[in-house]
């Protein structure tokens, strides 16, 4: 084989030996004609021109010189863009998530065919009318079409009938010609079938494979196929051969993955442009980073975007106030050139005339079709706001996606119909439209909502939930088709089907569940619930297929359990995470000293693949150079966005410690949450401002930042602290208490809005409002109190103090459960008085109420046996229920939790021992009570169940039996065994209990040395350790549903949706939270039995 000679300035390229399909076939890059059967098939062919020359210096690109991107789109049905994109969803997975880059490539490929195909772009912009049939010279360029060789039977070479059908007849002879060479290079039949999408690449890969591997040694067969099957794949591979060496060197120093990404997504022109302009792009005044160059180039039209960035970045930054990062974000999409030019033209108009912010304009422009979306916003924003009642923020949300133009036009047309005829709200219509393919989803909701509700029993809310994702149209149609099958044949519930469908790629996930559920259950021993849990994420299809393939390997070769495999797979990017665990688990354990459990913990989050790779790379650096422990590194990595958090810790830890006086432990506490990267950056920026201008301490700033959404909470404190203190009479301490929880931003905004209403109209005090708001989910709790307090007080006879106590312990869910019970009494709770119900709700939240509803096995007999063992109801045995509620409420409302214990002794006239004993009975250790760090109600309930004699085993999150029901059955069995055993003396019980008082909270207040014991599932106890306990009253109640584009940075719309899409955290066990909570003695068991129904009806439902 002749060697590939180096690139020369000559426009002609030396031909490779062998066939040159790139130069004779219209499907090659040289652009004779579009694919057969394409929408532009009849348009005249464009004169063939050489495209091998190096890009010229920055100047207006000629690629669209005859018309704009929108002119191109007008040449054919606009729906082609969306249909092609969404029909490519089987491989989409998570297109906007770093966890699934391969899926993004498929979107690029789909868009290339539908939106901006290089061979047809220049045809579409010509002024000549289309011909009725292809030109004769186009046929002349394909002698193989009429050749008998086109009828070759590839099955003789081992291809299946299905594989042969995927290969176009005219390409089969080329496949046969290069089959032997490609197989010899290690390509499979499936690889060759994929490569045949671009026939020119078959010969190129067959002839130059060894050269490709020498130039790109890390490239896999899949990588080569991924580049080769694209429109300019053959020439892109040739360009990599000649230019990879220089691109690997300064100033870009690109790695193999980056080179392949540019070639795969941007094509040959992007590779050539990056090579030609590498010095200009990275030097002054642009100063782009290699990652930014790759991001811009790795798109359709990447070469034009690079040219436009060189021309417009200085203008947009200096004249329009954008940042270089914003310019890069706009350019890093298909059509980036047009989007940048439109931003330059429309940004002043949209901001001055329509009231948008530059950030909103950037958000709209930073998508495929950004140019058209901006123009449509300019045209329709007044109409949608004035005539349809939408807000500018809602219009921006709709426009800020691929296909935003079509979505806005469809909202204008269908919003009245969907609201008036189908009962949807404008917010629901906006939610459906605010995704790629929003137009098609809205039209499908209009068509299928009546059918799904009437024929299949779904609710409108469920239909909206399915439609409000990428691929909503296809998901709705698939639910209509498969819901009966999955329920009747596979035993799923409609709710489970809806949950699977309510993700990006829901269609493919449902079809894969139908296909693989029997296999995974029968062959691999998974439960249907576990299969649903894996499927119930973006990329569920790929995750299920990977579990089928890797579960035996991971269990047999690496010692993982099926539950661990399921936990890894049950996240966005689960497919990639599983493959990375298989690859890196031995390395991380042997070379870095991690345990398999730690590896699983890191992988069991969105973006687990990237987090594992970053731990492998940065763990030695963070430990040796920055003094962190491996446990601290694992804790940071074990969150959504762990990769970014680790990299930011490496970068900012010295700055935050040296310049701002934080400790490494505080930096870890901030980073150890979803969105840790953003929180760290915001602390660096706002800590001086909050301390100097607002009087906060660094400890308070750290407390606010050490939660999911810490960035937003800090920014909201900066904005609202003066307002809440001056206008509403709160203290800075109270503002910090509200902000120092997950969802602190939303809680602060809700306090600002509802505090006057709750105080003036409902008679609450500001202290009570703060107590309700100072928890995870404070926003929802406040809104629920506003809605249900009149009902509970007027209709059911509760006092406002009782309502506040329920809301401060169990939140929104406990309040709704109490209302449901009082309105429609459940037989299992009918024997309880209102005081009993309130006490139970304060003690264990909704999990406790639900547990009693589901029934305590053999409860009447157990209660009778306890009464026989301890016949006297002594005063120290049964506490007054109202008293328990008052004590809990006192602690929850105390503005200085660390002083609450001493104040409570005075307030209630109790001794230290008596108050500690009361708290022990409600699942609080003495040390927690002394420092005011009461655990969440759900955690206290778990402890009570354990202390009652149950050996707590962490259930699978997808267990078929609910945790509460399983807990109660085990509790009953254990309690019965205890009662049958010989009775120890009461003093012995007390001694035994005292000797075992070693709760997790004991460790939680001893200092940083124990902070990072590997309990990554309980972040509220990790980060608490570096802060005064008065700031760390962590009582999570709810976890907000819905995927976030940037993990851990929720926006208002995401958290607002939590009122309708809520994943219950109450019922989930707190891993390790009660591992060593001391067992109850008989007096305490009797006290617990007094809290539960004692009539025979308790066991009636067992």
Curated annotation (Swiss-Prot):
Q: What is the lineage of its organism?
A: Bacteria, Pseudomonadati, Pseudomonadota, Gammaproteobacteria, Lysobacterales
Region called Disordered, residue ranges: 1-68, 127-151, 978-1021
Q: What is the protein's species of origin?
A: Xanthomonas oryzae pv. oryzae
Q: What does this protein do?
A: Avirulence protein. Induces the hypersensitive response (HR)in rice plants carrying the resistance gene Xa10. Activity depends on the presence of the core repeat domains; replacement with repeat domains from other proteins (AvrBs3 of X.euvesicatoria (AC P14727) or AvrXa7 of this organism) does not elicit the HR. Probably acts as a transcription factor in its host plant (rice) to induce plant resistance or disease.
The UniProt regions of compositional bias labelled Basic residues, in chain numbering, are 130-140
Motif Nuclear localization sequence A (NLSA): list the residue ranges: 951-954
The yes or no answer to whether the keyword Disulfide bond is present is no
Use case: By combining the central DNA-binding domain with the catalytic domain of the restriction endonuclease FokI, TALE-nuclease (TALEN) enzymes able to target specific dsDNA sequences can be created that enable eukaryotic genome modification. Other potential uses as transcriptional repressors, for transposon targeting, DNA methylation or histone tail modifictions are also possible.
What is the designated name of this protein? Answer: Avirulence protein AvrXa10
Repeat positions for Core repeat: 288-321, 322-355, 356-389, 390-423, 424-457, 458-491, 492-525, 526-559, 560-593, 594-627, 628-661, 662-695, 696-729, 730-763, 764-797
